[in-house]
Amino acid sequence: DMKNMVTMGLMALILAKRTGVRLERDLIFAAVADEEAGSHEGALYLVEEHPEKVRAEYVLNEVGGHTLFMGDNRFYPIQVSEKGICWFEMTVEGEPGHGSMPRPDNSVVRLGRALARLGEARLPQHNLPVVENFLRTLAAGSPFPNKAVLPLLLQPRFASTLLSLLEKHELEKAIGINAMLRNTASPTMMEAGKKVNVIPSSAKARVDGRILPGQSLEQFLAEVQRVVGPEVKINVIDHHEGTTFDADTPLYDTICQVLDERDPGGTPVPYMIPGFTDSFAYARLGATCYGFSPVKLGPDLNFTRMYHGHDERIPVDGFKWGLRTLWDVVHRFVT
């Protein structure tokens, strides 16, 4: 889901070769295929087994640099932070039996109730400085009602009610903001039973948990356990912590300068993505990583709705704009 960034990164390397620029620092292109599966066979493999090939002061990665409209104003979020993961399995035990005789301790029913509680709950709110700055910056450049509503989302006593109202009118915006304010857990897979007329003795579900930077695995699991109840056994499948990088760097300044030239009037703003990228792996080598895969968008395209959707796509003109923008950043920074 980031073939545009792969192409732009490769093209930047090709352009550096074609133009014969004199490099003042190494320029490394790394392409791997398993970020969606946890990065174990890709970025983590490179970091752990071949660190000399990918050791760098800075990394430019996916998710950032796309146009975000608030009214008539344009913003360009630059990813400086991302959540960690906790992929886990929920298991509920029950008494097996014949399907013709319903049981109150049916493991499938009990798991369903636990999943419903998890799906309906909002875990506790934890405001991060990068998220506070992001929402306040958007508010300052937005018309009413966003100008008033966005800062109120930082106050837990108002946030839940406002998000529920926002979900009825702008669902994608609501779920995106909600995921920036708290740890989240989305059930994605279920498994129970082998035969239609047999009540199984156990039922399982897999859940995609995302943890805010600064929150521990133990804190997250405690939040989830309080919601699903003590009868649910939780087993962690995979986990890594979230990351946050300093935006006060020469590379970040270069990105802002180029964006100002490529789209005067647009406002760069650091932000946190609710997902994760390979940046968490490269951070283990001390790299400062930014999500910057620029794409210029029109006001009618909901870009984040494309992620993992039925029709993932980007506009061709926006891609061409992004290719030139990324090259300008790379060229200016490495020469």
Q: Model regions: which residues?
A:
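Active-site-adjacent substrate-binding region
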Residues: 115-124, 140, 145-147, 161, ...
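Acidic/histidine-rich catalytic neighborhood of metal-dependent amide-processing enzymes
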Residues: 2-77
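Acidic-enriched catalytic cores of C-N bond-cleaving enzymes acting on peptides and small amides
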Residues: 51-58, 64-73, 78-87, 99-190, ...
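Short, conserved micro-motifs enriched in small and acidic residues
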Residues: 1-7, 36, 105, 313-320
